[in-house]
Amino acid sequence: MPSRSLPLLFGAALCAAALSGCVIISNVDEDKLPAAWKSEINPPAPRPPQGRFASAGLIARGAKPPVEGRLEWMFLPGQIRDRTPAETIELATAPDGTFTARAWRGGRVVAEVELPGRLDPKTGWLELERIPVKSTNKFGVTVATQSARVAVGSNGALYVQMSSTEAGVVLFLPAFGTGTVWGRWESAKP
């Protein structure tokens, strides 16, 4: 699909979704995070996000307690097609901000992505825009965009603030959704 038609699809889906009632908006602000998470990310550790982290972690989606979440959902959405998740995700950040994420399972790389990033000198967070999303929706056609802020907390855990927008047609109905979630993943033991 040509990139110039993406804004038209988003606009059409948003208008149709608003008329039909298929709109989902969910945002988690920093003030809604668990207290322990807040103390670990303010300020984040001065080192860029790199190293190996467990693929299984926690995602905060609002007032409810955090739920299990996979790190590959943040940087490699839809790229691991089989049902067996990655064991660890290896992250590397180059001095120019280029960010690489590799999903490891059984001693081999099963998915990899390289993204342009920008290190915010004031906060220490790495900002990533336009994370490629491969649709796994079996019930319709959707277009999604995803961006993230990444930092290592004072305890060595990885924190990700991910924002996404998705629009399209699902089960013959126009749909639109947007949201922001936070995730936390422990450093993997070598």
Residue ranges, per PLM feature:
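Short intrinsically disordered, low-complexity segments
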Residues: A16-G21, E30, R105-G107, L115-P116
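Sec-dependent bacterial lipoprotein signal peptides
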Residues: M1-C22
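Generic low-complexity segments that are intrinsically disordered, proline-rich and/or Lys/Arg-biased
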Residues: S3, L8, A35, A45-P49, ...
